[in-house]
């Protein structure tokens, strides 16, 4: 490329429309307002709400059924969109005393998302596995232990 062509590329690679930042801000706000997707399963009256997606969510749903059969109020939020994160889903959990992410990793990648969604008003725990899949019995036991630890 000639010097002039390089200068044109550099100059033209920046978007200089002054309305563009506001357009982007309003576009992202509309997406955040309208595109949150989730599935809620018995979370409205739950004492502890599990947050899981993928295989973990199917195992967590089994844990919810098992806990409910024992009289322990466990619920589940399954995020369908990870961006925008479904913060509106957490508004329906009026009785929740704690939240716990169930993940097939040892890092707790969703813990911070859940803490932000509940605005740090509730304890947020993590149950993860590295080798193999989580067991419903282990999830229920961990949720009960978390509730006892919080003294609620």
Summary of predicted features, one role per range:
Residues 25-48, 61:
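Glycine-/acidic-rich phosphate or pyrophosphate-binding loops and their flanking alpha/beta elements
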Residues 61-93:
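Generic long, charged, amphipathic alpha-helical segments
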Residues 51-60, 67:
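C-terminal substrate/ligand-recognition segments
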